Amino acid sequence: MSAMTSDTLTFECETGNYHTFCPISCVAWLYQKIEDSFFLVIGTKTCGYFLQNALGVMIFAEPRYAMAELEEGDISAQLNDYQELKRLCTQIKQDRNPSVIVWIGTCTTEIIKMDLEGMAPKIEQEIKIPIVVARANGLDYAFTQGEDTVLAAMVERCPGETKLSEQSQDKGSSKQNFSSTKGLFSILNFNKKAAADTQPQEAEDYIDHPPLVLFGSLPGPVVSQLTLELKRQKIKVSGWLPSQRYTDLPAVGKGVYVCGVNPFLSRTATILMRRRKCKLIGAPFPIGPDGTRAWVEKICSVFNVEPIGLAERENKIWEGLEDYLQLVRGKSVFFMGDNLLEVSLARFLTRCGMIVYEIGIPYMDKRYQAAELALLEKTCQEMGVPMPRIVEKPDNYNQIQRIRELQPDLAITGMAHANPLEARGISTKWSVEFTFAQIHGFTNARDILELVTRPLRRNNSLEGLGWTSLVKEGVLSN
């Protein structure tokens, strides 16, 4: 295969893979992330069935999302969409009183041309609650792009340059307050420890640099970890998009630097640059110890900060992963393509000693992922392994033929193809599991390898029992 002997990354494009989750599944993690929100999905029974099945595990938690089910009367324009949505939003306000209501458009609202953007401001004015419209429908390339659509819509609601100027004034006044407090303590002859306890951490812990906003939905502990990693380099994170509460959205505007933590947020990055005039830091994504180090180093270089202790920290993490690395070294992996995390995961697994045959990916924004692609190429060269072929919108039939030829030790695939591949002797891992797992930062690399090695460890256990085939002979010939 030509791509396997190439000295540079090879890009191909096939007919398209749409065997993936629907983007409205972003509701699953976003409603938990934004604690004062309510998500209203406007779609058909099919959307409702999908949400019930995909999110059914949270049925006892009284979730903050609901389904506005379109009926025949809605589609044939016999019912007034405005009145129906206003009634639902009024009911949501009475029952939950959220800080924001997010309307999630679906394929049906696109097809029947519902003017959600036109109705939202009028209803918002009447019920006095912000309404954000996000068209997270199945016409996207990958289900993770649902989050991209929601965050891009929320960018429009972020405070602007007025808030930024207020923050800079507050910063100056806090310094004055600190100096006056310090003088007061010296007058009262308090001991040094008491004076140190009142010292604002910002005055000592951070250098003076432009505001930095990070975008991408991550669990609270991971947000704290990444914020702390930058704090160790004396860099302050001004805010996260999305924030834990809608009322705490970060201020964005001219002079603000933004950096993404996920590879599927290209639309959000574009909106931040073009409409809010922010400056994008093009960094690899903080997935795995190597990616996290490169991410921090890139941010440091933009703010002219010399990174401290990153190499030692990365090496220490790799030492702690040695038990997993022994299982994956020399093994091969094939990405069928599902969630746009493929390039970052392939780069990390290459660093772990695996050989990546192919990276299938539903959609590739080469500008947004430029730094990640460069790091992948550099990693392959340093590890002395062939460059993988990158196939955008892969054709599943052709992929199956390539998998049969290559016989990889592991295929990372969508759920639709997992069982058929297992029946043909190919070990698989669901790609959707990487979406819901904590994979960002230095300390979560173990979670990635736990997912990757599980099918490999299962195979070793089955071989120990003498079970080398999960399917009877003769079944595969049918």
UniProtKB/Swiss-Prot annotation:
GO terms for cellular component: chloroplast. It catalyses: chlorophyllide a + oxidized 2[4Fe-4S]-[ferredoxin] + 2 ADP + 2 phosphate = protochlorophyllide a + reduced 2[4Fe-4S]-[ferredoxin] + 2 ATP + 2 H2O. InterPro entries: LIPOR_BchN/ChlN, Nase/OxRdtase_comp1, Protochl_reductN. Signal peptide: none annotated. One of its GO terms (molecular function) is 4 iron, 4 sulfur cluster binding. Gene3D superfamilies: Nitrogenase molybdenum iron protein domain. [4Fe-4S] cluster binds at C22, C47, C107. Its cofactor is [4Fe-4S] cluster. Binds 1 [4Fe-4S] cluster per heterodimer. The cluster is bound at the heterodimer interface by residues from both subunits. It comes from the Eukaryota. Component of the dark-operative protochlorophyllide reductase (DPOR) that uses Mg-ATP and reduced ferredoxin to reduce ring D of protochlorophyllide (Pchlide) to form chlorophyllide a (Chlide). This reaction is light-independent. The NB-protein (ChlN-ChlB) is the catalytic component of the complex. Protochlorophyllide reductase is composed of three subunits; ChlL, ChlN and ChlB. Forms a heterotetramer of two ChlB and two ChlN subunits. Belongs to the BchN/ChlN family. This is Light-independent protochlorophyllide reductase subunit N. It comes from Chlorokybus atmophyticus (Soil alga).
